[in-house]
């Protein structure tokens, strides 16, 4: 999705009270902040198989039910255990392996790694975004070598239509069979159903797919990303206990939780605390709503963004009136690596003691994107989130997406600072 066109559409449709459907964790979202979807959910704030210049990667490789790769490892045969008992699942962008070579992954910060994305088709088949099945084989092998579980993530941003068609009528049996085949023929340990946006009417199919996979492959791990919630709008979470009954992890996409919408002030991509009517999203407020809806804490995870959000002038900090400011860059367009190499300075860094996250502030537009305020996560905010996970008894964290956190020009041992922080603060 083209970043600026999506941003313009977000602003227009949000003003009209409609679901923009431009954003989410997955294929097709380049740089906008997460779009509000129906029911008050944020449709995720991350993910995309495009960069700010357009589509990357080669032709898609079709995944059906007849691959002849090696047998799958049972999910239970990989411990994945950590000192804290928490999980850490990072999403690896299949369309951009050059940005983060598998050989450079900091495995000590992960218990699970998800190959993103396999795209569902109306006939129940799937295509791997980027079209490189060997990449999946290599990632699975490397993960297992390091004691990390490998997950096939299905869907991504704007995948709702594909899921609905693949799970309709007689197609759902074929779709589920192909998912089982993906497990048994590649070595994946589980399936991640990244259905975005997921409306109330989609919930029965989400449950049906998991049940079919569990019946055929009882040892498979089942995970699902879920939306952050706008407290002004609320959300109908009555179906989530049934979803939690058939999924092992429900991970909140708690990044990209800001925008330049009517009625909003400038805000953070991933605020831990502090919500009001003009900044209506935080991790804590969302977690409380899911827990109140009887989602078990031990199955609930929170998200950490490996990218930031960039606002234009006159905004220079969080919780300011927009006064014409726009959100000019987000996922893919302003990765953590780009923030650290093109924007960061100790004098620009500030700390929001209420939201418990950092930000960069500039008095005038800062190249290359003209940012005057950048929200992002760093080692200190990850430590805060790790402490929160432990205090609340939550299951763990996810990261969108791993490729954006890699500092290729840093010295060896210093190229994955965010994963190192997760190792220290979440897993131990």
What is each PLM-predicted segment?
Residues 83-183, 316, 323-324, 348, ...:
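Glycan-recognition patch characteristic of GH18 chitinases/ENGases
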Residues 95-103, 132-139, 174-179, 231-240, ...:
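Alpha-helical scaffolding within the catalytic cores
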Residues 113, 152, 193, 250, ...:
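Conserved, mostly hydrophobic/aromatic
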Residues 155, 190-196:
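Mobile, glycine-rich extracellular loop/lid and propeptide segments
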Residues 109-110, 261, 299, 304-390, ...:
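Glycan-binding loop/region signatures in secreted carbohydrate-active enzymes
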Residues 8-20:
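Bacterial N-terminal signal peptides
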Residues 18-83:
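Ser/Thr-rich, Pro/Gly/Ala-heavy low-complexity intrinsically disordered linkers and tails
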Residues 122-134, 195-339:
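Substrate-binding surface in catalytic domains of secreted glycosidases
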């Amino acid at each position: 999705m083209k970043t600026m066109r999506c941003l313009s559409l977000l602003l227009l449709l949000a003003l009209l009270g409609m679901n923009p459907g431009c954003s989410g964790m997955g294929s097709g979202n380049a740089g906008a902040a997460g779009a509000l979807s129906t029911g008050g959910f944020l449709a995720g704030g991350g993910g995309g198989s495009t960069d700010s210049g357009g589509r990357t990667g080669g032709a898609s490789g079709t995944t059906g039910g007849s691959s002849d790769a090696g047998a799958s490892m049972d999910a239970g045969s990989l411990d994945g255990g950590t000192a804290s008992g928490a999980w850490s699942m990072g999403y690896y962008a299949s369309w951009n392996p050059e940005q983060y070579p598998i050989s450079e992954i900091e495995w000590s910060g992960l218990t699970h790694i998800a190959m993103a994305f396999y795209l569902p088709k109306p006939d129940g088949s799937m295509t791997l975004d980027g079209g490189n099945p060997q990449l999946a084989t290599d990632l699975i092998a490397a993960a297992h070598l390091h004691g990390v579980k490998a997950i096939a993530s299905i869907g991504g941003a704007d995948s709702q239509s594909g899921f609905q068609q693949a799970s309709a009528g007689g197609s759902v049996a074929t779709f589920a069979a192909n998912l089982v085949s993906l497990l048994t023929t590649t070595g994946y340990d589980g399936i991640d159903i990244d259905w975005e946006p997921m409306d109330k009417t989609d919930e029965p199919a989400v449950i049906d797919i998991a049940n079919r996979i569990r019946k055929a492959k009882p040892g498979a791990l089942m995970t699902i990303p879920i939306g952050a919630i706008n407290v002004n709008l609320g959300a109908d979470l009555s179906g989530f206990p049934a979803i939690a009954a058939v999924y092992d992890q429900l991970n909140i996409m708690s990044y990209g939780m800001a925008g330049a919408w009517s009625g909003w002030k400038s805000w953070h991509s991933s605020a831990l605390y502090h919500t009001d009517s003009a900044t209506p999203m935080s991790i804590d407020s969302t977690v409380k709503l899911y827990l109140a809806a009887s989602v078990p804490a031990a199955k609930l995870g929170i998200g950490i963004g490996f990218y930031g959000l960039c606002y234009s002038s006159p905004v220079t900090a969080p919780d300011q009136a927009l006064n014409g400011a726009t959100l000019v860059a987000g996922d893919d367009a302003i990765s953590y690596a780009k923030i650290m190499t093109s924007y960061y300075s100790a004098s620009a860094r500030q700390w929001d003691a209420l939201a418990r996250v950092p930000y960069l502030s500039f008095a005038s537009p800062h190249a290359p994107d003209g940012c005057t305020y950048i929200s992002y996560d760093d080692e200190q905010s990850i430590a805060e989130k790790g402490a929160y996970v432990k205090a609340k008894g939550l299951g763990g964290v996810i990261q969108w997406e791993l490729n954006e956190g890699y500092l290729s020009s840093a010295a060896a041992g210093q190229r994955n600072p965010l994963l190192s922080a997760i190792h220290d603060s979440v897993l131990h």
